[in-house]
Structure formats: C-alpha cells, structure tokens
C-alpha cells in the first residue's frame, strides 16, 4: 500500500488476522503508555461482559465533525446527517475478533472493491485526509447491526477519555522531556501529573 497512513489504518482493520486464537482485540497506540494495570471494568461492562464503546455526540462545527463525520458515513454506508456520534473517544477500544471480518466484508460489498483500494483512493483524492478505523468500526457497529456486541455508554468527551493511559503526540519523534515523562510513567515511579510536574509540562 503506497501511503503509510492508509497502510496502518488497513492494518488495524485486519487486526483479527494477527491473533486468530483471540476472542477480543484491544487497541493501544504506540505513543501511549498505561498509567496503571488495567481492570476488567476499564475495557468491559461488568454486567453484560461486553466491550465498552463510549460514544460522544458530534458538536456542530467542531474539528471532529469536520474531520470525521462525512468520510465515516461514506465508508459505512449511511447519510452524514444520520451519524450522530463519534466513537474514537479514547485509547483502549476493544472489539470482538470476528467483528473485523464482518466489517471488511460489508465495506467491500458496499463499495464494490477491496477495502485497501478504497482507502488508497480516499487518501489520493483528499491529499491525505484519512478515514479513521476507530470511527468506522464504531459507526458500523452502532448503525449497521452490531449494537448487541457492545455496551454503549453515552458520555462526555472528558469522561470518555478517562481510560488509564497517557498519550503524547510523537509524530516528530520523542524529545528529551517527553521521553523522560514516558519513562517515568512506565517505571511506575509516580502518577503522570507528578512526572510532568517534575520535568515540565508536555503538551
């Protein structure tokens, strides 16, 4: 696949192929560290034992709406005005392994070609403005028949992002301060806030 971002998105949409014996797949980005051991309730609803899929209503005119709403609706086959929620709300999103294949097959039937081709063309036609794998998986589940596979808490953006992880943008590499903050958290020496206080705030 010629575009690196398109390739990593497609890679995540094929996560099931990497772990054939797993029942579920939990995604945590490579620029993210956990701030404590995960509890079952961080990932699954304790009552239903289904993966948590927090959803946040799109704010009209917001960056999230402008960036994700139309392309997500196009990818999953619904009207943009019917897509009320965003689903890329936090790190630690989890999906049943079988769900990925269901999504890929449905997307390929809808668009009449391999999903990898659709992603490459999307990148080319928009000069690199991507679809989001997590927005697409969430929207497909909510609007196209997968609601029974997840628990759907409707939350605010702040509550949705309360997953115990620290994510720092690393596209430009790790500078000295950021590296020290991440090493501090990984070492378990302190909380993220204390690590940042001692080393200087990292945005």
Task: Cite the ranges covered by each PLM segment.
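Nucleotide-sugar donor-binding/catalytic module of glycosyltransferases
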Residues: 6-8, 32-42, 137
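A glycosyltransferase accessory/donor-loop signature
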Residues: 110-203
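Aromatic-acidic/polar surface patches that form glycan- and anion
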Residues: 4-8, 92-93, 126-133
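Non-transmembrane alpha-helical segments in soluble domains
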Residues: 13-16, 104, 138
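Conserved catalytic core of nucleotide-sugar-dependent glycosyltransferases
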Residues: 35-124
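Short aromatic/hydrophobic "clamp" motif used to bind/position activated sugar donors
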Residues: 25, 31
């Amino acid at each position: 696949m010629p575009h690196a971002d398109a390739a990593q998105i497609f890679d995540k949409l094929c996560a099931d192929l990497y772990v054939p014996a797993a029942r579920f797949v939990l995604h945590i980005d490579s620029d993210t560290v956990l701030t404590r051991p995960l509890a079952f309730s961080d990932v699954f609803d304790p009552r239903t034992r289904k993966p948590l899929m927090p959803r946040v209503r799109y704010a009209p005119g917001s960056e999230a709406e402008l960036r994700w709403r139309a392309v997500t609706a196009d990818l999953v086959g619904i009207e943009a005005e019917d897509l009320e929620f965003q689903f890329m709300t936090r790190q630690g999103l989890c999906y049943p392994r079988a769900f990925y294949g269901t999504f890929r097959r449905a997307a390929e039937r809808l668009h009449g070609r391999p999903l990898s081709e659709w992603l490459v063309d999307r990148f080319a036609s928009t000069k690199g403005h991507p679809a989001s794998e997590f927005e697409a998986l969430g929207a497909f589940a909510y609007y196209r028949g997968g609601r029974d596979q997840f628990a759907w808490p409707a939350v605010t953006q702040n509550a949705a992002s309360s997953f115990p992880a620290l994510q720092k943008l690393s596209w430009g590499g790790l500078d000295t301060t950021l590296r020290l903050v991440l090493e501090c958290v990984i070492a378990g020496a302190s909380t993220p806030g204390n690590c940042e206080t001692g080393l200087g705030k990292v945005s």
